[in-house]
Amino acid sequence: MKKIVPIIALFLMMSACVKPDKPKEIRFSVLGDSYSAYEGFVDPETNDVYPYENIGVKSAEQMWWHKVATKTGWSMEKNNSFSGSLVCNFDYVHYYGSYSFLRRMNDLGSPDVIFIFGATNDACAHNGDYVPIVPIGDYVYADWTEEQLCTFRPALAYLFEYLNQMYPQAELYFLLDMDLGSGSIDVDRRDLFIGSIHRIASYYKVKCIDLEGIQKSQWHPNVDGQETIARQVIEALQIDFNV
């Protein structure tokens, strides 16, 4: 017993000197379109941005992703958002197939969480007669052709497949505007896109955050809309990460 006591005391002294591990800093990346593209806060910096000052969003601190970072204590690894971009590789006038989500999905850094925020342009892109022009395509989950990747459903499936393989450590979230294309497309097309996103996200076990009631000016989230997005994203993260 005399020998055991000093050993226990020594163990307790050593334990007291060991500092607990710091919690791992969580880093997130954004793959998006104009809803997330704020001047000076996109990477690459050559990405097209949206002139948010025209609708009253005067600083990056008012953007949804900044609010999420502030609330959670996370840091943004990369914001690879490009105004006007499609998920798919369809190319028409000012809708740039060369800057699609598929062309940029390999440039997100090393995030722990990836937010994919898009599909608005795929649903709403139109010709001079305001007729939607991006084909929705079929449900294809393997062996995609270049032609199929110029349509929405196969492109979204390929995007999720690639992100799961390229960033296996990352949690994926698709942010879905439930009022997709309000005022610019009919309800049937909107519902077709929303249903397609839900189905493909479910197939790949990508978490879909359905965003309701986003306030907009000129079809883009204004100050209140950015706050609405952030609040609903944070609510979802509170369930998964207890932030």
PLM features per residue range, with description:
Residues 162, 170-212:
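Substrate-gating cap/lid alpha-helix
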Residues 217-243:
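Histidine-centered active-site loop/cap adjacent to the catalytic His
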Residues 73, 119, 161-168, 198, ...:
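Sec-exported extracytoplasmic/periplasmic mature domains
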Residues 27-31, 36, 76-81, 112-118, ...:
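Structural recognition of the beta-strand scaffold that forms the well-ordered cores
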Residues 41-135, 141-145, 154, 220:
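Conserved SGNH/GDSL esterase-like catalytic core that processes O-acyl groups on lipids
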Residues 56, 140-151, 185-192, 221-225:
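Alpha-helix N-cap and loop-to-helix initiation/capping positions
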Residues 102, 156-160, 194:
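Generic structural signal for well-ordered alpha-helices
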Residues 1-60, 70-71, 107-109, 165-170, ...:
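N-terminal secretory targeting modules
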